[in-house]
Curated annotation (Swiss-Prot):
Keywords: Cell membrane, Disulfide bond, G-protein coupled receptor, Membrane, Receptor, Transducer, Transmembrane, Transmembrane helix. Its main location: membrane. It is a multi-pass membrane protein. Residues 60-69, 126-142, 210-225, 292-333 are cytoplasmic. Disulfide bonds join C102-C175. Receptor for chemokines SCYC1 and SCYC2. Subsequently transduces a signal by increasing the intracellular calcium ions level. Receptor for XCL1/Lymphotactin. Residues 1-31, 90-103, 168-190, 251-267 are extracellular. This is Chemokine XC receptor 1. It comes from Homo sapiens (Human). GO terms for molecular function: C-C chemokine binding; C-C chemokine receptor activity; chemokine receptor activity. The chain crosses the membrane at residues 32-59, 70-89, 104-125, 143-167, 191-209, 226-250, 268-291.
Length: 333
């Protein structure tokens, strides 16, 4: 991240609303709006994802791979949300945290970013196998299998973030890419992963829908709905931002030189970036509206909390039987 006062900045997240005096008011509004939004998203994500983690650990079985994937998505969103207050500070004071934290925080940011898309992709592949070829996922995965899959995704995320870690440094513009080449490479890499995962997920859901239309099992229909909602929310949030980042590379490489178009892109990048960064608080909302089991568990948790405050006996616990769900269903159906 960076202080936005330098129009030559090459950082991944840069947009320049301050390059012209007439844009001063727009910049002040953008700074205020982003500060308020990030603080709100941080609080919502912290509360929402913490509740999801509590429900998963207390009421659900972690022998299910789908539960493991959702748990890791929550962790990834929590890490992402905890970085939002850090990204506010450059708007007001520039980068004041030094070179080491510049590299470290951008590495953590990238790991969180890539882990989300990798877990969504592998969760969709797992759902595809469960629906299209249910016998292949009927057996409960061993602890070793669950650990290996989780570790593989996090290791892949760390390796994917190496570029952002090495080539970020503190410059006059703030915490920034050291050269335009590395900025372009990073954008293209992220766009590539985004498009590959989108292609894989689209293929899986086409096959899933074809199978479900031939099946009369309402259970199987329910097992797809929440994951589909999570995936759609992710791509609707991050898709516009990835597209505007790609358009920005056309200006940086001077393929497009229109000043008016560039200014419009800066506004679009501001809006799309704030939408994308708000995604970390969306999943708990989806669990409430789409996940029947999560709603039930959440009501029970809130009732317990309320009865605790009134110093009255809490209602009877919801029965919960450990073990994998049929067809390795998602937690919150």
């Amino acid at each position: 991240m960076e202080s936005s006062g330098n129009p030559e900045s090459t950082t991944f997240f840069y947009y320049d609303l301050q390059s012209q005096p007439c844009e001063n008011q727009a910049w002040v509004f953008a700074t205020l709006a982003t500060t308020v939004l990030y603080c709100l998203v941080f609080l919502l994500s912290l509360v929402g994802n913490s509740l999801v983690l509590w429900v998963l650990v207390k009421y659900e079985s972690l022998e299910s791979l789908t539960n493991i994937f959702i748990l890791n998505l929550c962790l990834s969103d929590l890490v992402f949300a905890c970085l939002l207050p850090v990204w506010i500070s450059p708007y007001h004071w520039g980068w004041v945290l030094g070179d080491f934290l510049c590299k470290l925080l951008n590495m953590i940011f990238s790991i969180s970013l890539y882990s989300s898309i990798f877990f969504l992709t592998i969760m969709t592949i797992h759902r595809y196998l469960s629906v299209v070829s249910p016998l292949s996922t009927l057996r409960v995965p061993t602890l070793r299998c669950r650990v290996l899959v989780t570790m593989a995704v996090w290791v892949a995320s760390i390796l994917s973030s190496i570029l952002d870690t090495i080539f970020h440094k503190v410059l006059s513009s703030g915490c920034d890419y050291s050269e335009l080449t590395w900025y372009l490479t990073s954008v293209y890499q992220h766009n590539l992963f985004f498009l590959l995962s989108l292609g894989i997920i689209l293929f899986c859901y086409v096959e899933i829908l074809r199978t479900l239309f031939r099946s009369r099992s309402k259970r199987r229909h329910r097992t797809v709905k929440l994951i589909f909602a999570i995936v759609v929310a992710y791509f609707l949030s991050w898709g516009p931002y990835n597209f505007t980042l790609f358009l920005q590379t056309l200006f940086r490489t001077q393929i497009i030189r229109s000043c008016e178009a560039k200014q419009q892109l800066e506004y679009a990048l501001l809006i799309c970036r704030n939408l994308a960064f708000s995604h970390c608080c969306f999943n708990p909302v989806l669990y409430v509206f789409v996940g029947v089991k999560f709603r039930t568990h959440l009501k029970h948790v809130l009732r317990q909390f309320w009865f605790c405050r009134l110093q009255a006996p809490s209602p009877a616990s919801i029965p919960h039987s450990p073990g994998a769900f049929a067809y390795e269903g998602a937690s919150f159906y």
